[in-house]
């Protein structure tokens, strides 16, 4: 399963808000 990021939150610790891409080695949206 591929995890996509929301490009809305700049404070998102797992995604780059500027590029809307997941940061390397980050696990988000698991159990949310």
UniProtKB/Swiss-Prot annotation:
Tissue: Expressed by the venom gland.
Localization of this protein: Secreted
Family matches, as InterPro entries: Disintegrin_dom, Disintegrin_dom_sf
The keyword Transmembrane belongs to this UniProt entry's keyword annotation: no
Superkingdom: Eukaryota
Gene Ontology CC: extracellular region
Predominant location category: secreted
Signal peptide (UniProt feature, chain positions): none
GO molecular function: hydrolase activity; toxin activity
Disulphide bridges, residue numbers: 5-14, 7-15
Keyword presence, Hydrolase: yes
Keyword terms of this UniProt record: Disulfide bond, Hydrolase, Secreted, Toxin
Quaternary assembly: Monomer.
Function in brief: Snake venom metalloproteinase that impairs hemostasis in the envenomed animal.
Similarity comment: family membership: Belongs to the venom metalloproteinase (M12B) family. P-II subfamily. P-IIa sub-subfamily.
Record's protein name: Zinc metalloproteinase/disintegrin-like CdtV1
